[in-house]
Amino acid sequence: MRNSVFGLSIALAVAAPSIAAAPTSWIDAKTGHKVLRLSDAPGNYALYFNYNAYTPQGDLMIFQTADGISVADTKTWAVRSLLHRPGAHLLFAGHKTRTAYFSEQARGGDDATITIFAADIDTAKVRRIAVVPKGSRIDTLNADETLLAGQVASRDMPLQPNAAGVDIKTGQTAYAANWPDGRPMVYADAKEFRLNQRLDAKIPMEIFTIDVTTGQRRSVVKATDWLNHLQFSPTDPTLLMYCHEGPWHRVDRIWTIRTDGSQMTKVHTRTMNMEIAGHEFWSPDGKTIWYDLQTPRGEDFWLAGYDVATAKRRWYHLDRNEWSVHYNVSADRTLFSGDGGDSEMVAHAPDGKWMYLFHPKPVPDVAGIRADNADSLIEAGTFAAEKLVDMGKQDYKLEPNARFSPDGKWLIFRANIEGKAAIYAVEIAMPRS
């Protein structure tokens, strides 16, 4: 099947360049780090933690508001509107070109299609790439910007039956369910219950690619597994990571595959009951897949790394309070971040509501004596944790999705610590006295 393709660049609903607004700043009273509020505009949305938000040069970060697409200068953090286009859904920035990719869904009808666009970040000129069927979701762009990848299900199944929409404060599905005796589940349990219902439905799905130049659509793999979270390698244009979605203790979650459907590889194999792995992401050099690993769930916490070339593994251990919804890694791969979690989440952390900076520390050989089979074993380490932001007022139904700035000097995240959702940045270095 070939989708409709439009090669002509067009400028659609482009706003005149706006004056950049300076961010509001303060010093976090508990950590001493400088925090900036970049935007609290209605509908603000900072991209998911493993989506690229930066231009190739690292000078601008893209994000979404109810009015369209905005950019933040990564040196000054001044914010301006790029594209006035209500209804646009921001996808990601290009790895090679200064391009913001976004989608729009046609209004009305059961067969409403989704159109994929590319906007020049400097000129705001827009071109159409392709039209995909209703229910399709574009998740990722490959390293040389020749292919988009997405997934589609044969039918829709709302995760929360009879839901009126999303939680206004968090922008997330308002999961709710009851135990057999009628008692209401906490949010985290209700979410697992609804995810399990979707997994058991075994809805036929497909992963596909779209040629960015021609719009041609090609199938990669079909399955009744719940396929989700596609991520191209940031350096290898044909290597695609994806997941089997559902309760993590039931599924073999993390997989890689080539765009021609070959070399399907399972990244992690469970070794104990209730062991879980997920929230996977690439290292910037494309050599390592990192993921949250718990052995077992809710008891022992690791950030695990898998070398895609050698299958060598490195695991960093975390304390319960340091477990985080999502982790990330700096561009130079020397630092990691974690965005914490609340007491109802999987770690049940009594004091976990912090934005963290992690310094990796290897576990050394005792007396310099290396085991004979050490090279075939998991390389273990720990994290030295530093608290950057007090997230005590955060409602973690809104996931912070922290990411490092390209220069490694800031951590950018989304939070509702002041009552409503906003995009923030925290400086990693302590302010000069």
Task: Identify what each model region corresponds to.
Residues 48-50, 66-108, 114-116:
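Blade-loop segments of beta-propeller domains
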Residues 289-302, 317-383:
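Loop/turn-rich, solvent-exposed surfaces of beta-rich toroidal or solenoidal domains
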Residues 19-36, 192, 196-208, 370-379:
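Blade/loop signatures of beta-propeller domains
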